[in-house]
């Protein structure tokens, strides 16, 4: 009994003592480490040549371990070194983002991005020319940006990532986007872009000039596995749906556009497009890499716009054709495309347009050769001169060296394959020949190139250098004006105003004339230059290389630049000639001369 009493007393003392200690002498336990729901990985950043461009910290959240996230600030820093984006938390789940050129807000509860000028917020073009806004420019040294008019000036943009199941995240210091998602938001008309292949981030500081051969084989190689993880397959499909619904340029001719792509979104449009669309949807969602790649190819059939959009990731992603992966993948892709065609017989009409254009181009080249000779770029008959101009591309490296003072000015002797050189040579010959009155620029077999060259030509022919386009996301119409080095002496000065040609200009076009070969006739016709031939082939959108979530690249017509004429009309249907010609008359110089001289006499 005594022992029990003593034990009871002891227990009471312990209990009372414990109560007293909890107030007067608290016991401090060991620190409990913060439990993070992600891991971070510092990964190398390279350019397309594999040269080091630094490192960047990526996050991988536990619920999506295969999908890389990046802070907005870190992403800005690799895209525009020396700059960043600051994030300020303004309320629970609400953040204000400030970049060097603009602002935006993010709601991480609703997964919502908003901005009154999202192009300013993502503007990287200051790296190309100081003070330049986010507009289309290939940065050939023969022209330079002058001004940009936007109508209206600002439009509020709301991008609802949550609608597509894309999760935006944050901590106290920054906002985090899936890497591919923010890369899609930033890619611009110069093709500044970034992609992540699971090991390395690739950036393109020189835009399209560093991606002339597409995505490098070394960058693509780590992606070439037979399967994809479930979280990557799910996210990649959601991200593709968001991008092609919101950022597609909607030229107006694709099968999915005609099936309500813009109104329904990509996912629903595929579900509603019969067996062909449903098959494509399942392939794109597949964890089998071969099936997925096949799905990007069949999607390309549904978005075929004549030559700008290629969602088939094998088009610009270099894959070694001697590898077992390529052999197996190509067998699956070929079989799936054949199956798709049985579900989508209307695709035959789309493919026929491409085939007919190619056949016409071959026919016209043969007729030109028969009349003027093989490879002849300048041909004169009586008072009329023809200049064969087969591409809106030039040897940009040669011209860049000249403008930097590192090399001689390109000439027909040193750069015989440069179409810009050929044009200038032809103009000088015609201008200095007293017999020549009419100058016909033949772009009847020209499939496109750089809009910078288009601006150069409109400046010489019409003293105008205005690039007209609309943003299909915001509805804004743009007029981007350029200074042009009209005498190509390497300087932008008053001597450029002295350049003048006393010639009756005309343009020869056909359905093969596509993209820039469609833009030039659209502008020249509005400026009063006669067009001869057949209706041009269309192609109204600027083209972007875009990263897929897996790390592949694809290309598509972008919302950032759907080309318009001076009336504000989409030019994708093609441009009707002033005088229609049968193919037998394209190089009937006598008939062409009569039409051109009649036009100018009655003008």
Where are these regions (language model features)?
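Flexible, low-complexity junctional segments that flank or bridge functional domains
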Residues: 101-105, 119-439, 445-447, 452, ...
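Amphipathic, non-transmembrane alpha-helical segments in extracytoplasmic/periplasmic proteins
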Residues: 67-82, 175-188
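Bacterial Sec-dependent N-terminal signal peptides
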Residues: 8-9, 15-35
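Extended intrinsically disordered, low-complexity coil regions enriched in Ser, Thr, Gly, Ala
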Residues: 79-111, 191-197
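Positively charged n-region of N-terminal signal peptides that target proteins for export
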Residues: 1-4
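Linear, non-domain "peripheral" regions
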Residues: 40-57, 64, 83-85, 141-161, ...
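C-terminal "post-core" interaction segments
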Residues: 207-227, 234-237, 241, 393, ...
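N-terminal low-complexity, Pro/Thr/Ser-rich intrinsically disordered segments
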Residues: 25-56, 222-225
